[in-house]
Amino acid sequence: MDSLARQSAKICPFVSRVTSSMQQVQVLHKTNMSAMAQQCPVMRRAMAARGYVTASPPAGAAAADVGEARPITPVLERGTQERTFDYDGLFETELQKKRLDSSYRFFNNINRLAKEYPMAHRLEEEDKVTVWCSNDYLTYSRNEKVMETMKRTIDKYGAGAGGTRNIAGHNRHAMRLEAELAALHKKEGALVFSSCFVANDAVLSLLGQKMPNMVIFSDEMNHASMIMGIKHANVQKHIFRHNDLQHLEELLAMYPKSQPKLIAFESVYSMSGSVADIRKICDLAEKYGALTFLDEVHSVGLYGPHGAGVAEHLDFEAHRKAGLASPAQTTVLDRVDMITATLGKSFGSVGGYLAASEKLVDFVRSYAPGFIFTSSLPPAVMAGSAAAVFDQRSSLHLRQLQQKHTSYVKTGLGDLGIPVQPNPSHIVPVLVGNPDLAKRASDILMEKHRIYVQAINFPTVPRGTERLRITPTPGHTNDLSDVLLDAMDDVWKTLQLPRVSDWAAHGGLLGVGEPDYVPEANLWTEEQMSLTNDDLHPSVFSPVEKFLEVSSGIKA
């Protein structure tokens, strides 16, 4: 203790000031160190922040504090003339940066009309526009079955869940939804989160924190939620070039197979429409001993015979014939360790989820703060989401109609020479290449043509690749598409925006006008597009009845 006191006197100016000898320090320690520590500006704050195992202090703690309390004269008082930090000034400076680089966001007041989809009104209900950029890909937000299910549920169970899943917020709606999601992806378990942003952040950060020496490999175009989760994981990470599997393998080869590794990527990248080679990524994961973390946010509902996403689509026939059962052979869907996705796009409501093995789901359920310490989704939301997942599973025609409308728009824009970034998916990214012009193009579409298409600028996309992002749905008929095409042609003429030939004259960009670019074939083949709901397995037309044990907790 003498050694500790000597060290304290050397390090702490407070100790050296209030003690004239080491004997005094020793006496201080033995008699009244607690009271003296309260006079130290550092220790006073540290002692005020007491920790307890429970959420509240143990009984008697407050009384003990009162018994030890003594009148304290502050040792150090700040000068009354010292200026307060200019908080508003900092906020304004940061906002001005975004205005100057054209990344400041303006929100459009868009109120989508369920009975007039894809119409919406702005501030005034008579001021109507056609929405062409919603992520409600299959229009389930206004599906009659979904809305009726939500109405019945809210009438019976009220507006909110009442708490976290651990405290009063766990119910049959959560269990039914998780059973449907696990069945959709043919995984042992599923776990519902308040959003897929939260799911990605919670799962990735937890795995990094719990696995010793984990290394994460992330596609450079991954969503902000995955980037945030990887940052919170606080582990070694490598960013591989977008869809560049040679680069990914070079990075994986740097580490022994026994070291924990995870590859994080998306199936469909929402701002470009590019698609990952999931099969080859699984090959690399197995070769180098890595887990696979696949975000299917922009593909669930849209790909595969049952809407499970691109991983299912890659073995389309095997899954179509097997229905809810797993095919006899190993599929890409089997090989992906973790799938995350959203309830807020193709399924029309809100929320996110993880589908994985029972042990992994139970691990996340038991340890992830982003799941544990947040209120459960409302019963009506979960019931409506389960109804949407079930209904779309047997609605092959909706997926096909969305693909047909997308193809019509892409072909029409191509005929006009309007530059669409080529891709094999349902996304229609129209290249502008300038943030101010992209914003003006969006404004003209809205004000002159009553068409809402959002401009996409930095930081969502790299500078110089600014674009308009169009997302046709089953509700966007060919007649509506013709109106859009005429409006786009007018905007390109008005603003004298570069067409495909103009991009080609400068060497091209992002596949637009690039002389050696070879476009990928669409994910949906003509044979798949010719199928009907009658070609689906009978098992997909019945809801999943059995709840998952992992949803409530597995009994030892």
From Swiss-Prot:
PROSITE patterns noted in UniProt: AA_TRANSFER_CLASS_2
Species per Swiss-Prot/TrEMBL record: Eremothecium gossypii (strain ATCC 10895 / CBS 109.51 / FGSC 9923 / NRRL Y-1056)
Job of this protein: Catalyzes the synthesis of 5-aminolevulinate (ALA) from succinyl-CoA and glycine, the first and rate-limiting step in heme biosynthesis.
Cross-referenced Gene3D superfamilies: Aspartate Aminotransferase, domain 1 (3.90.1150.10), Type I PLP-dependent aspartate aminotransferase-like (Major domain) (3.40.640.10)
Cross-referenced Pfam families: Aminotran_1_2 (PF00155)
Compartments in which it is found: Mitochondrion matrix
Catalytic center residues: 345
Transit sequence range: 1-46
Protein name: 5-aminolevulinate synthase, mitochondrial
N6-(pyridoxal phosphate)lysine modification, residue list: 345
GO BP term, pick one: positive regulation of organelle assembly
Pathway info: Porphyrin-containing compound metabolism; protoporphyrin-IX biosynthesis; 5-aminolevulinate from glycine: step 1/1
Protein EC: 2.3.1.37
Cofactor: pyridoxal 5'-phosphate
GO cellular component: mitochondrial matrix; mitochondrion
Presence of keyword Repressor: no
Entry similarity comment: Belongs to the class-II pyridoxal-phosphate-dependent aminotransferase family.
Main location: mitochondrion
Sequence positions that bind substrate: 105, 218, 237, 460
Catalytic activity: succinyl-CoA + glycine + H(+) = 5-aminolevulinate + CO2 + CoA
Any one GO MF annotation of this record: 5-aminolevulinate synthase activity
Keyword list, A-Z: Acyltransferase, Heme biosynthesis, Mitochondrion, Pyridoxal phosphate, Transferase, Transit peptide
